[in-house]
Amino acid sequence: LRLISMNIYQIFTRLYGNPKHNNVPNGTYAENGCAKFNYFTDERLNRIRKFGFSHVWFTGVIEHATQTDYSAQGIAVDHPWVVKGKAGSPYAIKDYFDVDPDLAESVPHRMDEFEALVCRVHKAGLKFILDFVPNHVARQYASDVAPEGQRDLGADDDSEMA
């Protein structure tokens, strides 16, 4: 029996490589910035590999509730009373079929940018782990990119019941 050694490097994706270092408490996206999928360059990923890591565990990739307004891109606005801080919790999933628009250079092409990241990770000889918790969702869960025929979580719930 041969055991395989795994060394996992966990990244809170929105912080890695963020050029804004002076965070404003309860600051907005414009004030505090956000890392992007494209910040994970071949050079940076190869450096992670050279440190001896075999896997990269990306946290906060799936679209979650936020106070950043992406309604111009067809993404529903979240009510601020149910969002944790301005950036939101990466575990308040808003759409399991989409990625966080904050992490994209171009919001309409966010999935292409994410898929390119996965390819870069594999090209660097690393495995990609996507962090998610299957039973944690935002209060206003609603997919805007779900496959045809896929019902949203809670769509058939009886709203008259507690």
Map each language-model feature to its residues.
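N-terminal structural segment of carbohydrate-active enzymes
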Residues: 1-127, 135-161
